[in-house]
């Protein structure tokens, strides 16, 4: 099979799941022997690309001619077969850079957001959920809908250690791993945990992550009398993260809004019972009473009721974890998504 040279790029702040997805698609396509060249702007200098070397071309705005000329030179130097653009900014920059060029390289937009209008100039589309595809197609003409497009989820890496679903322990240990920012719903979870305490339901909880709301969340937990029950270790990685997840009975992802939520896929991969919300982005992957419990988003009472339900129905809690684990193996693991990525790029380049 032919091997392609691919520029994989993101512009605009890529903190969170988007940056992970940039590296993931680099890894999936590299696993099929393609040559991947990573490119970013200076706004993502704080993000680590691991062992991947990365090129940097600053972009000062959507219509920066200087940036477009530098990118044009970069395209001429690298001679790629395909450009994968992970943001509207990246799509515009590369389409502008190729204006008037004899040989046009196809641009594949990867849509990680519900704000899709800037990506419509792309030649092909990878939507991370069916809902993202609906949003794009609602803005496309009938002609544009014929461009290659496919729904391919984000991926999860299956643990290298034993991670099969197990019955909940008593008292349950609830774990959340997230950025401490408003849309992640950490403050809602803390209110829900206070309700569980009021109801006399025993538990312990670890809310791990950094972010602008960390101090506020700690203060909230203290005010609600949760100091003995809830800990805030900050950012956790490596073996500490593995140990934390292994000790979890319930993984909580209480996001108020989410595009997909890689945390959902990770909970599935680890075989953990998941409590999350009914936000439209989350419902693309988490199905209520099938592979997760989906409480009302931004509703502490609904979240507390859900956790209480799982604790009092351990057989169901285990069943959801088993279904999530099956989906991780069949749909969301690296090998499955890598195959889909590879198949799709052949439909674009040929």
Language-model features and meaning:
Residues 16-24, 172-200, 205, 212-218, ...:
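A conserved mid-protein helix/loop that constitutes part of the nucleotide-sugar donor-binding site
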């Amino acid at each position: 099979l032919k091997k392609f040279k691919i520029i994989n790029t993101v512009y605009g702040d890529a903190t969170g799941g988007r940056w992970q997805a940039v590296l993931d698609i680099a890894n999936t396509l590299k696993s099929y022997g393609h040559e991947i060249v990573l490119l970013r702007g200076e706004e993502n200098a704080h993000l680590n690309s691991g062992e991947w070397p990365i090129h940097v071309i600053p972009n000062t705005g959507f219509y920066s001619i200087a940036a477009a000329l530098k990118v044009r030179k970069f395209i001429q130097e690298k001679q790629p077969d395909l450009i994968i653009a992970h943001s509207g900014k990246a799509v515009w920059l590369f389409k502008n850079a190729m204006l008037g060029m004899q040989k046009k390289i196809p641009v594949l937009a990867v849509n990680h957001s519900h704000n899709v209008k800037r990506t419509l100039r792309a030649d092909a589309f990878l939507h991370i959920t069916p809902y993202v595809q609906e949003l794009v197609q609602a803005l496309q003409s009938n002609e544009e809908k014929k461009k290659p497009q496919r729904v391919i989820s984000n991926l999860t890496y299956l643990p290298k250690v034993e991670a099969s679903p197990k019955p909940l322990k008593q008292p349950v240990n609830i774990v959340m791993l997230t950025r401490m920012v408003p849309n992640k719903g950490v403050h809602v979870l803390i209110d829900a945990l206070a309700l569980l305490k009021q109801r006399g339901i025993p538990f312990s909880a670890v809310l791990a992550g950094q972010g602008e709301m960390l101090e506020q969340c700690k203060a909230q937990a203290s005010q609600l009398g949760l100091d003995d029950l809830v800990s805030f270790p900050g950012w956790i990685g490596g073996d500490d993260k593995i140990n934390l997840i292994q000790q979890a009975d319930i993984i909580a992802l209480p996001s108020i809004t989410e595009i997909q939520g890689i945390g959902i896929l990770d909970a599935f991969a680890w075989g953990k019972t998941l409590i999350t919300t009914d936000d439209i982005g989350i419902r693309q992957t988490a199905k209520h009473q099938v592979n997760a419990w989906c409480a009302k988003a931004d509703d502490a009472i609904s979240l507390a009721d859900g956790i209480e339900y799982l604790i009092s129905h351990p057989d169901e809690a285990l069943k959801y974890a088993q279904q999530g684990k099956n989906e991780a193996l069949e749909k969301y693991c690296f090998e499955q998504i890598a195959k889909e990525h590879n198949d799709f790029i052949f439909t674009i380049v040929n």
